Amino acid sequence: MYSISDLKKFKTCPRLYFLEKRNPPPRPPQFIRFDRTISDLAARKLHIPPEQVFIGHTGDAKEKAVTALRTYRWLMKARFEAGKLRVKVPFLHKNGAAWDLYFTSLSLYPPATDLLYYKSVVWVLMQNGVKIRKIQLLHLNETYVRHGEPDPEALFVRSDSFYNAHHHPTLRVREAIAQCTDDPLAIMEKMARAALSDCPEAVYTSHCRGRSTCRFYALCFPLEAQAPHNSILTLSDSAGRRAMWENGRMRLKDAALDEIEGTAQQYAEIMAG
């Protein structure tokens, strides 16, 4: 069974997906279930009657959510499956013959950047015969100031749209999902074919060393991982450091100034190198 995280990981780097399956990262201890608190507050924002809601849990059989569609007006964190993909749906509300779908976001102005997640949820629901009438986001309110107990009415904003870099509503959520070219089924078919072969070869992409370095970087590129401290490959937040390295600019002091982002930290590293 796949999760949306598996699909996103495979899309980013098939090798990363296989390496993490073999060597999963340690899970940090969870002293506070933050997601539970957010879900409870969001449920109060949506005015969900406790007697009319089905609440899903980890490990639920897929039949539980399908049965709940026939007996409840609200579904919260219900687990649905389609093909080999299992998803957790934040909130569903029965509205006539269709359902309203609500996503939660901890962003103040959620952008349209994680569309594979949204599309995967919608795809699984559609495969289960769920007709979706409306899709909205519940995101945090920038102007909210807490006084005493959290106030869900003021804490959350309901929006039909994603936001741009200037915090203005842009593309409607439903339209953004419809325009997303990622196909969950096609990705899973590629994953199934890849599972029949050995771990893919290492291919360098911008995800290998962006603002953070992939934890398998040394395994994929052992020679680069052993580079000296003054190597151009150690330049912080640089999208072009590998290209410079491949073009013979091996050391920090050899950096092409027109090929760097020009941050103060980069200049300091170049001067020190």
Predicted regions and their residues:
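Short runs of predominantly hydrophobic/aromatic residues within well-ordered alpha helices
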Residues: 7, 88, 118, 211-216
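Metal-dependent nuclease catalytic cores that hydrolyze phosphodiester bonds in DNA/RNA
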Residues: 1-98, 112, 242-247, 252-256, ...
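A residue-level signal for conserved active-site and pocket-lining positions in enzyme catalytic cores
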Residues: 13, 91, 121, 214, ...
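Short alpha-helical "patches" and their helix-cap loops
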Residues: 26-34, 134-141, 225-237
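Nucleic-acid nuclease catalytic cores
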Residues: 80-185
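A broad, structural surface signal
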Residues: 40, 44, 119, 123-126, ...
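Cys/His-rich finger/ribbon microdomains and the adjacent scaffold used
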Residues: 166-273
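Short helix-capping/linker segments at secondary-structure and domain boundaries
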Residues: 22-26, 46-51, 128-132, 220-227
